């Protein structure tokens, strides 16, 4: 399936107000903006049938400044309930409906909405909300294997969409999500909310300025501590009261209920550690780590991916590895990813076990949710390492939701337009494919596929009948 390449000139100059990066006067000479006339190559995923794409403006009804946007929430577990809370902080939004296949989730979310001053309709089948013409938009915070289907159907129903990351379970699904957004002229914001965080915007500005010099290597990492038994080897069990297990599975294979597959926990539900529903740490944290690099380097994708991973320590009934390492060959630099669930030591002395580092001929930069850290090379024109956490740069979620609302009104592309998240998610999915197929995966971006035969079975997401993903 062809992907049309679109050139989009991006002005990078101007006053950057890099308050997070304070170079010496000597460094200021080097800290010059890029040529504003220099174009950046963008690759927008378009429908094979010739879907029209405009670089910044969608067609469709534009809401007035005083209109409130009626929004429904599909999936109100841990993340969905959090999203409901963020949405209630945006005055232009009117939560009107919630959906979950588990009755206690519906009850909890309805109570949360009522506490915030909203009366919502609670349903068990998301199709009721999509069929309701009074609903303008939906938030999708289900397990990953539902993201693509619900997003496509919401676009077809004329709803704008906020969908959590990763965009999908497989790269093929992600492509159809972008096609649906373009075909039906919908605003689709992905939940990669770091793009609305000041730390990450400043990192992108610093990279664009050229202050780090020529960049050839980047590194991403995620570390934590877990018990050997982690989530345990729980046996299959009766379906809990109030849970529609068959609907929870949806397009995934029909299997008996298992507490770990469902993963009803306060934090990090365990469904994400089964291949039927998600992609483990690689597509959970990995998307948040790779996405800042795409934000810095113009959404470019790698030419190839090689990954290794195993369950060396953890002994539970989940599928995904406890230790993983991946190498991504981008056109002008290499990126590595490491995930250690058995060792919590953070890198670079950070007090958060996750981050992204960028290394150039003048210095290095580390960015995470706590700040931006610049480390000059010896003899560099940069002077003095800086590490700061500016409080007003930290908020991400509510500003991300406000951006979604603004774009619904103006029909502009949002900060995390679905295409950006599909790219970041697909890169992480390719790493999992490389690991599972035990092969290097070369990425043919123009045709959204890989020539490696061993990888091809993993590139196609199979849906259980009667579910079909059709744009």
Feature-to-residue mapping (PLM):
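Conserved SAM-binding strand-loop segment of SAM-dependent methyltransferases
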Residues: 120-125
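Contiguous beta-strand/loop segments that form the cofactor/metal-binding neighborhood of enzyme cores
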Residues: 201-202, 214-419, 423-471
């Amino acid at each position: 399936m062809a992907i049309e390449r679109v050139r989009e000139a991006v002005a990078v100059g101007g006053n950057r107000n890099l308050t997070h990066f304070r170079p010496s006067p000597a460094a200021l000479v080097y800290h010059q903006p890029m040529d504003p006339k220099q174009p950046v190559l963008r690759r927008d995923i378009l429908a094979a049938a010739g879907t029209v794409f405009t670089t910044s403006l969608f067609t469709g009804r534009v809401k007035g400044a005083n209109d409130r946007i009626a929004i429904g929430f599909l999936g109100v577990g841990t993340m969905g309930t959090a999203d409901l809370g963020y949405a209630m902080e945006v005055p232009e939004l009117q939560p009107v409906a919630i959906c979950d296949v588990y009755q206690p989730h519906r009850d909890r979310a309805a109570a949360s909405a009522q506490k915030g001053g909203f009366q919502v309709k609670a349903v068990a089948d998301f199709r009721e909300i999509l069929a309701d013409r009074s609903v303008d938009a939906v938030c999708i915070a289900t397990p990953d294997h539902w993201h693509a289907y619900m997003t496509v159907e919401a676009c077809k129903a004329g709803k704008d969409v906020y969908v959590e990351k990763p965009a999908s379970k497989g790269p093929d699904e992600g492509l159809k999500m972008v096609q649906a957004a373009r075909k039906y002229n919908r605003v689709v914001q992905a939940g990669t909310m770091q793009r609305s965080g000041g730390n990450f915007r400043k990192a992108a500005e610093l990279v664009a300025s050229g202050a780090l010099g020529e960049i050839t290597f980047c590194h991403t990492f995620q570390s934590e501590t877990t018990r050997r038994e982690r989530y345990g080897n729980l046996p299959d069990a009766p379906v809990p009261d109030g849970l529609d297990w068959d609907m929870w599975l949806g397009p995934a294979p029909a299997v008996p209920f298992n507490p770990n597959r469902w993963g009803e926990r306060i934090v990090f539900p365990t469904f994400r550690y089964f291949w039927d529903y998600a992609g483990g740490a690689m597509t959970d944290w990995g998307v948040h780590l790779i996405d800042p690099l795409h934000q810095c380097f113009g959404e470019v994708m790698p030419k190839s991916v090689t990954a290794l991973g195993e369950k060396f320590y953890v002994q539970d009934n989940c599928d995904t590895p406890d230790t993983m390492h991946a190498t991504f060959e981008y056109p002008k630099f290499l990126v590595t990813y490491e995930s250690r669930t058995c060792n919590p030591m953070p890198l670079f002395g950070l007090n958060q076990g996750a981050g992204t580092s960028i290394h150039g001929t003048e210095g290095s930069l580390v960015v995470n949710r706590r700040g931006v850290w610049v480390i000059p090379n010896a003899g560099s024109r940069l002077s003095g390492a800086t590490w700061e956490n500016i409080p007003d740069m930290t908020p991400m979620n509510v500003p991300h939701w406000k951006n979604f609302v603004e774009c619904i009104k103006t029909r502009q592309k949002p900060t995390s337009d679905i295409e950006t998240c599909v790219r970041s998610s697909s890169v992480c999915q390719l790493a999992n494919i490389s690991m599972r197929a035990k092969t290097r995966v070369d990425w043919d971006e123009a045709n959204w596929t890989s020539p490696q035969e061993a990888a091809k079975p993993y590139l196609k997401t199979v849906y259980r009948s009667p579910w079909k993903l059709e744009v």
